[in-house]
Amino acid sequence: MSLEEEILWAEKYRPRSLDDIVNQKDIVERLKRFVKDKNMPHLLFSGPPGTGKTTAALALVHDLYGDNYRQYFLELNASDERGIDVIRNKVKEFARTVAGGNVPFKVVLLDEADNMTADAQQALRRTMELYTETTRFILACNYLSKIIEPIQSRTALFRFYPLKKEDVVARLAYIAKNEKVEYDQKALETIYDITQGDMRKAINILQASSVYGKVTVEAVYKVLGLAQPKEIREMIMLALQGNFLKAREKLRELLVNYGLSGEDIIKQIHREVTGNEINIPDDLKVLLVDYIGEVEYRIMEGADDEIQLNALLAKLAVYGEKYLKGK
């Protein structure tokens, strides 16, 4: 296998410049102004995983400094290095030296900054103030609420949102064609439905599914170790039709054959109930979603998976008798 084949597609197809980023248009336009002015404040990128926070930061520094941007740029993952020592040593050592060239500052990217301890964030705040003449900080986080207020007030906030379905599917199709991989359109849509706007995860699933020669819905679910949607729907309908014992047998089959956890199955049940493949009244959907949420909570709190899922199937049978009888 060649080195190129070993490269993760998520990295191979990561945009290198702000001009290459096709989503988050408002954010990109604001960042381009910083490049034009060769000046910017400290930045705080907030949003779900896979929405382009790190990509935008890397593209920004590339456009600021050119191909040699690495000598003006320090990237740290706060998940791995979350303590005060990192701030005192690595960041301070980098920040205290003056940048050369046309841009009068260097850039530090702290990815997953919401994983930093409160003390480390306080140390970071002081470092940001001390070296503001020579260094700009970009903090990327999934949860804005975990960033202390003194840092939030010293940064310009950029909110990244989950990518639209058409953008993700189009990007997956482009990558598949470029890699000469056959695919079904439905499979790409399924990848989006599973990843919900997380581009990095979507591309990783596409690459993993490509080993089957053609990316199909079946290949996607096989790669993820999830049950086929039609099997989940069959179990749901058996329960709604009052056939609790057969529904329970199907559940047991799914648990054994796929090695799924209760959390995996409950998420798939939720996806099918809220989708369009199962034809049930909206008022019943509301009740089911509410109860599914209760069961998921109990499972996450440590209750026995199979007992809770059996209770859910029993509830489906009761609701089916009440809402679907005679239909």
UniProtKB/Swiss-Prot annotation:
A GO BP entry: DNA repair
Pfam families: AAA, RCF1-5-like_lid, Rep_fac_C
Gene Ontology CC terms: DNA replication factor C complex
Subunit comment: Heteromultimer composed of small subunits (RfcS) and large subunits (RfcL).
Coiled-coil blocks: none
Residues annotated for ATP binding in this entry: G47, P48, P49, G50, T51, G52, K53, T54
InterPro entries membership: AAA+_ATPase, ATPase_AAA_core, DNA_pol3_clamp-load_cplx_C, DNA_Rep/Repair_Clamp_Loader, P-loop_NTPase, Rep_factor-C_ssu_arc, Rep_factorC_C, RFC_lid
NCBIfam families: PRK00440.1
Taxonomy, superkingdom: Archaea
This protein's name: Replication factor C small subunit
Key words of the record: ATP-binding, DNA replication, Nucleotide-binding
Family: Belongs to the activator 1 small subunits family. RfcS subfamily.
Function text: Part of the RFC clamp loader complex which loads the PCNA sliding clamp onto DNA.
GO molecular function, one term: ATP binding
